[in-house]
Amino acid sequence: MGSESSGTAELPPLPQVGIGTDIHAFEDGRELWCAGLKWEGEGTGLAGHSDADVVAHAACNALFSAAGAGDLGQHFGTGRPEWSGASGVTLLAEAARIVRARGFRIGNVAVQVVGARPKIGKRRDEAEAVLSAAVGAPVSVSGATTDGLGFPGRGEGLMAVATALVVRGA
């Protein structure tokens, strides 16, 4: 067994992975924001304290999870009125800043949105560009339906699941 005094090099830090989810119900009278984009002509938006962007929120939760930095509610929850009505992109940029301030580099974030609408594929490139700019690292977005099963399949709301990879060190 080596030791630092014997000249053995210190191993590089291991990557850390986090998982995040977010779920919001549709609510009449709200604009639909999803994956950092406003979706015109999609009918109702999502209920929430902020813009209720499930993709951005799940990405925030994944980043916080990977860095051991709490969760979305802790940083931006309903008890924090300064975040009321905030855009998901703003929250995501702030989440990335918090993670970096804790000494982590962000490798990437992958998010899958689950629901019947909007159809992510037609605006995937645009969404990935907006979210990647907010994070300062690659963000990929995919969509899935539930073949009519559960609340997303019945058109009652949206759900998103995300993973994030971070590594300690500048």
UniProtKB/Swiss-Prot annotation:
InterPro entries: MECDP_synthase, MECDP_synthase_CS, MECDP_synthase_sf. One of its GO terms (biological process) is isopentenyl diphosphate biosynthetic process, methylerythritol 4-phosphate pathway. It is an enzyme of class 4 (lyase). Its cofactor is a divalent metal cation. CDD domains: MECDP_synthase. GO terms for molecular function: 2-C-methyl-D-erythritol 2,4-cyclodiphosphate synthase activity; metal ion binding. Transmembrane segments: none annotated. The record marks 49, 145 as: Transition state stabilizer. A divalent metal cation binds at residues 22, 24, 57. Pfam families: YgbB. Belongs to the IspF family. Binds 1 divalent metal cation per subunit. It comes from the Bacteria. Keywords: Isoprene biosynthesis, Lyase, Metal-binding. The lineage of its organism: Bacteria, Bacillati, Actinomycetota, Actinomycetes, Kitasatosporales. Pathway: Isoprenoid biosynthesis; isopentenyl diphosphate biosynthesis via DXP pathway; isopentenyl diphosphate from 1-deoxy-D-xylulose 5-phosphate: step 4/6. This is 2-C-methyl-D-erythritol 2,4-cyclodiphosphate synthase. Its EC number is 4.6.1.12. It comes from Streptomyces coelicolor (strain ATCC BAA-471 / A3(2) / M145). It catalyses: 4-CDP-2-C-methyl-D-erythritol 2-phosphate = 2-C-methyl-D-erythritol 2,4-cyclic diphosphate + CMP. Involved in the biosynthesis of isopentenyl diphosphate (IPP) and dimethylallyl diphosphate (DMAPP), two major building blocks of isoprenoid compounds. Catalyzes the conversion of 4-diphosphocytidyl-2-C-methyl-D-erythritol 2-phosphate (CDP-ME2P) to 2-C-methyl-D-erythritol 2,4-cyclodiphosphate (ME-CPP) with a corresponding release of cytidine 5-monophosphate (CMP). 4-CDP-2-C-methyl-D-erythritol 2-phosphate binds at residues 22-24, 49-50, 71-73, 151, 154. Homotrimer.
